[in-house]
């Protein structure tokens, strides 16, 4: 089972969980979610069990006490501080969506922490028509059910959403005012995010994974990163933004890439 713990630094506290017993560090930086992914720690451990033998897997939440304004680069800085406090260096990073934005800044500002990284369904600069703005509006209005519906319809394929719609909507009943306030701060943190002009500072091996049906950020954003870095790109044709949850061999593709770049 995953162990949920808290790391305390001079500036903040951050919760995380870990599992696996390998000598290499694998750090997962999740994207936006209505409630903390830590509540699904055991499910995540099962989904990523293929890493557990060769890696110690760490998944970091955002800091516990959010400042009123919290740009993505500051999220990455706080994560770097947490990693340092836990003795994590030269890690294999997977960042999904907003977590992928954080991963870019982590590799730019703290190259010693990153051995290799995979960027999933993310962007180096957030497009003007991003669906995130609609989510911010719904969170501001306190519309938990509307936000849950919009979020799920945008990130999942129609077939996946139809299959799990009742379960997804039932989750809205557990979303608190505090959850909405936290979501709003984190979502607003993507506004003005732009790492594009600094991507050439990334020196580690990178794999970019995108989805042709991504309605949140778009597949073009994945291609833009890969073109700028000159790195490997793979686009899943039949999946949307949450391809990292839906595609059955997604984790295996990450694992193979990390194996290829291991010295």
Regions found by a protein language model. Give the residues of each.
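Conserved HGGG/HGGXW glycine-rich cap/lid loop of the alpha/beta-hydrolase fold
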Residues: 8-66
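Conserved alpha/beta-hydrolase "acid-adjacent" motif
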Residues: 215-221
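Catalytic histidine-centered segment of alpha/beta-hydrolase-like enzymes
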Residues: 239-251
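Conserved alpha/beta-hydrolase catalytic His-Asp/Glu region
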Residues: 127-130, 146-198
